UniProtKB/Swiss-Prot annotation:
Reaction(s) catalysed by this chain's protein: 3-deoxy-alpha-D-manno-oct-2-ulosonate + CTP = CMP-3-deoxy-beta-D-manno-octulosonate + diphosphate
Pathway annotation from the record: Nucleotide-sugar biosynthesis; CMP-3-deoxy-D-manno-octulosonate biosynthesis; CMP-3-deoxy-D-manno-octulosonate from 3-deoxy-D-manno-octulosonate and CTP: step 1/1; Bacterial outer membrane biogenesis; lipopolysaccharide biosynthesis
Record-level GO cellular component terms: cytosol
Gene3D superfamilies xref list: Spore Coat Polysaccharide Biosynthesis Protein SpsA, Chain A (3.90.550.10)
GO MF: 3-deoxy-manno-octulosonate cytidylyltransferase activity
Compartment(s) of residence: Cytoplasm
Coiled coil: none
Upper taxonomic lineage: Bacteria, Pseudomonadati, Pseudomonadota, Gammaproteobacteria, Pseudomonadales
Organism: Pseudomonas paraeruginosa (strain DSM 24068 / PA7)
Entries under HAMAP family matching the protein: KdsB (MF_00057)
UniProt record, GO biological process: CMP-keto-3-deoxy-D-manno-octulosonic acid biosynthetic process; lipopolysaccharide biosynthetic process
Biological role: Activates KDO (a required 8-carbon sugar) for incorporation into bacterial lipopolysaccharide in Gram-negative bacteria.
Annotated protein name in UniProt: 3-deoxy-manno-octulosonate cytidylyltransferase
């Protein structure tokens, strides 16, 4: 029997490139409702939206979601997740999946996959997903986070830089991917064991996390194991810019 899990969707109003992003209309529904709809199609026993904004709270209540108003001073999404897990009274061995509030096209199967992967790997406190990188532009794009894993699928590190650096190949040609190097892009969906979240918050950010602006590096810094599996379905890009929003509107608006 598959272990039950809870989905938490963080939603912040503030956004440098797209203010009020969770409330942007997509084919008649606010984006946060689109994400919530996808999460409810998963096997999650509970789907909760977490926001620090009264406008988002009201919108979510309007379409019938379970929603919590959280503190506004969290350093990261995982810190916010810990508050939610604590307020919901989730057990230390429970699994919670963090689904980003700007992923209206997220496949429900990936939510189920990351939760099942964590349940199947008791040595890990976190599970996440990745997919192959097929073009050199993505490899050199700092907005595409790269991940390297060991033989057991455990993360060695994450970076915005090309990872690993193909020393010999890139000494000459940087216009194509080197042969035989399985470059992978990290997909930002996580499953956590609830008992780990309090430790994560108590540690506070480390210099490596701050340098790359990647909070998962805090876990690796403290020796926490992160299991990384190849996504079973394609993860379409989320919404970061007005251009992304128009693209998603075209997809969902027919």
């Amino acid at each position: 029997m598959t272990q039950a899990f809870t989905v938490v969707i963080p939603a912040r109003y503030a956004s440098t490139r797209l203010p009020g992003k969770p409330l942007q209309d997509i084919a008649g529904q606010p984006m946060i409702q689109r994400v919530w709809n996808q999460a409810r199609k998963s096997a999650a026993s509970r789907v909760v939206i977490a926001t620090d904004d009264e406008r988002i709270l009201a919108a979510c209540q309007g379409f019938g979601a379970e929603v919590l108003l959280t503190r506004a001073d969290h350093n990261s999404g995982t810190d916010r997740l810990e508050e939610v897990a604590s307020r919901l009274g989730l057990a230390a061995d429970a699994i919670v999946v963090n689904v980003q509030g700007d992923e209206p096209l997220i496949p429900p199967a990936l939510i189920d996959q990351v939760a099942a992967n964590l349940a199947a790997h008791p040595e890990s406190a976190i599970a996440t997903l990745a997919e192959p990188i097929h073009d050199v532009a993505a490899l050199f794009n700092p907005n595409v986070v790269k991940v390297a894993t060991d033989v057991n699928g455990l993360a060695l590190t994450f970076s915005r830089a090309p990872l690993p650096w193909a020393r010999d190949a890139f000494a000459g040609d940087r216009d194509s991917l080197p042969d035989g190097v399985p470059y992978r892009r990290h997909i930002g969906i996580y499953a956590y064991r609830v008992g780990f979240l309090a430790d994560f918050v108590a540690w506070g950010p480390c210099w490596l996390e701050n340098t790359e602006s990647l909070e998962q590096l805090r876990a690796l810094w403290h020796g926490v194991r992160i299991h990384v599996a190849d996504a079973r379905e394609t993860m379409l890009p989320g919404v970061d810019t007005p251009e992304d929003l128009e693209r998603v509107r075209r997809v969902l608006g027919g």
